[in-house]
């Protein structure tokens, strides 16, 4: 069996166990693109009020639309713990138009991206990778916004 086939078998077994809390460590590593799509569909159908899934991953793009809450850890502990709704209400993500107001900026092939305080209540798409980079680069500013210590 290939790594991807073994991973699919493990995931199928885990979901079939129908446990109230399922812990998944890097669940999409080794899966091809169609299998990742199937994984997202299965996971979306699995979670309900009686079942929770905790995912540890570096492949945030594979699961970011499925998340209700995000916890970012660093060597000092919990750097951020918030719901996706809370994050999007307090922060905005996008192109760096106002660098002076940005908490964090980074240059990409698509241009400069930023995280800034959402003081004008703009509705932007959560970018977990950008959030992670902002949190690790400017932990104190993020902690102050979310009242984390």
What are these regions (language model features)?
Residues 1-8, 33:
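ABC ATPase nucleotide-binding domain "signature motif"
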Residues 11:
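Hydrophobic anchor residue at the start of the ABC signature
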Residues 22-26:
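Catalytic Walker B motif of ABC-type/P-loop ATPase nucleotide-binding domains
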Residues 36-49:
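Helical segment within the ABC ATPase nucleotide-binding domain
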Residues 56-58:
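H-loop (His-switch) motif in ABC-type P-loop NTPases
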Residues 63-65:
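A short, surface-exposed alpha-helical micro-motif characterized by mixed small hydrophobic
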């Amino acid at each position: 069996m290939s790594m991807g086939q073994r991973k699919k078998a493990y995931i199928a077994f885990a979901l079939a166990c129908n446990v109230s809390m399922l812990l998944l460590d890097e669940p999409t590593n080794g899966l091809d693109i169609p299998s990742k799509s199937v994984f997202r569909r299965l996971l979306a159908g699995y979670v309900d009020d009686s079942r929770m899934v905790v995912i540890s991953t570096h492949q945030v793009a594979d699961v970011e639309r499925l998340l209700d809450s995000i916890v970012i850890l660093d060597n000092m502990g919990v750097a951020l713990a918030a719901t996706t709704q809370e994050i999007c209400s307090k922060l905005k993500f996008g192109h760096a138009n106002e660098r002076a107001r940005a908490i964090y900026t980074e240059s990409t092939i698509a241009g400069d991206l930023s995280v800034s305080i959402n003081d004008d209540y703009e509705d932007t798409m959560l970018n977990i990778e950008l959030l992670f980079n902002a949190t690790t680069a400017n932990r104190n500013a993020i902690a102050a916004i979310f009242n984390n210590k």
